[in-house]
């Protein structure tokens, strides 16, 4: 049995799958326009993909934007994510800037969760996790493979490593090249949940063929899925209204 993780007014727990919707925009005006459209969309949590923001290298501008986003989203929980170029993001920044950006967001009092990518310097990961937790911010630790689906054992190893590094919510997203790859991701998720997980997991198989993994989290053990209102942030994301309908049918 995994321990539940509560973020504001939502709880990540076994047998439940929450819906996260990405907030994307290049300019502050575009971001805020999109943010207002998300408030009543039915999402459980919003992910600001700050790597799409053209001024992401200017910490002052990022924090100013974050304050306005926080106001626009009202009580909705907010996940702050800079997705690196190597894992499918829009912008490349230095490792130093990556950790500084996430640390500033965690300490700002404006975000509820930050995303830290697994494949980084472990000492820096440990320090950032500690800083986030000290600020009362939860940590999603993530890995994204946009080219393939690793072996089941490798998926499980990465999720367990995230747990060891202090993640509140380990996350992995992989790209299937065959139906068997989708089954590999689902089997890895179920095995992780039943044998090794001490906290909720987030897993998905991307692209159209991986869509089944986005709606069966309650069965296999993924505690969050990603839906869209407008622009998707990853291949295979489903419009939130359709996503919730299918999830309700399957539950």
UniProtKB/Swiss-Prot annotation:
Catalytic activity field: 3-dehydroquinate = 3-dehydroshikimate + H2O
Pathway listed: Metabolic intermediate biosynthesis; chorismate biosynthesis; chorismate from D-erythrose 4-phosphate and phosphoenolpyruvate: step 3/7
Pfam family, one: DHquinase_I
Keywords: Amino-acid biosynthesis, Aromatic amino acid biosynthesis, Lyase, Schiff base
GO MF term list: 3-dehydroquinate dehydratase activity
PROSITE patterns, sorted: DEHYDROQUINASE_I
GO BP term (any one): 3,4-dihydroxybenzoate biosynthetic process
Highest taxon, organism lineage: Bacteria
Enzyme Commission no: 4.2.1.10
Catalytic residues in the record: 144, 171
Chain residues that bind 3-dehydroquinate: 47-49, 83, 214, 233, 237
Family in the record: Belongs to the type-I 3-dehydroquinase family.
Subunit structure: Homodimer.
Matching PANTHER family: 3-DEHYDROQUINATE DEHYDRATASE (PTHR43699:SF1)
Stated role: Involved in the third step of the chorismate pathway, which leads to the biosynthesis of aromatic amino acids. Catalyzes the cis-dehydration of 3-dehydroquinate (DHQ) and introduces the first double bond of the aromatic ring to yield 3-dehydroshikimate.
Protein name: 3-dehydroquinate dehydratase
Species the sequence originates in: Klebsiella pneumoniae (strain 342)
């Amino acid at each position: 049995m995994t321990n539940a993780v509560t973020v504001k007014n939502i709880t990540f727990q076994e047998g439940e799958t929450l819906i996260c919707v990405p907030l994307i925009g290049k300019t502050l005006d575009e971001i805020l326009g999109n943010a207002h459209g998300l408030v009543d969309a039915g999402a459980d949590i919003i992910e600001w993909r700050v790597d799409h923001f053209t001024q992401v290298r200017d910490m002052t501008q990022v924090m100013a934007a974050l304050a306005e986003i926080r106001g626009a989203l009202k009580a909705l929980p907010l996940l702050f994510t800079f997705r690196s170029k190597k894992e499918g993001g829009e912008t490349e920044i230095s490792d130093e800037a990556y950790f500084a950006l996430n640390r500033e967001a965690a300490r700002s009092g404006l975000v509820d969760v930050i995303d830290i990518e697994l494949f980084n310097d472990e000492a820096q990961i440990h320090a950032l996790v500690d800083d986030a937790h000290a600020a009362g911010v939860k940590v999603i630790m993530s890995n994204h493979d946009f080219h393939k689906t690793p072996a089941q054992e490798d998926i499980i190893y990465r999720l367990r490593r995230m747990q060891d590094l202090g993640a509140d919510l380990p996350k992995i997203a992989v790209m299937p090249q065959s139906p068997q790859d989708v089954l590999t991701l689902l089997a890895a998720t179920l095995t992780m949940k039943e044998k090794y997980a001490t906290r909720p997991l987030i897993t998905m198989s991307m692209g159209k063929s991986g869509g089944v993994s986005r709606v069966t989290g309650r069965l296999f053990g993924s505690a969050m899925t990603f839906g869209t209102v407008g622009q998707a942030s990853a291949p295979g994301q489903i419009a939130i209204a359709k996503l919730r309908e299918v999830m309700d049918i399957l539950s």
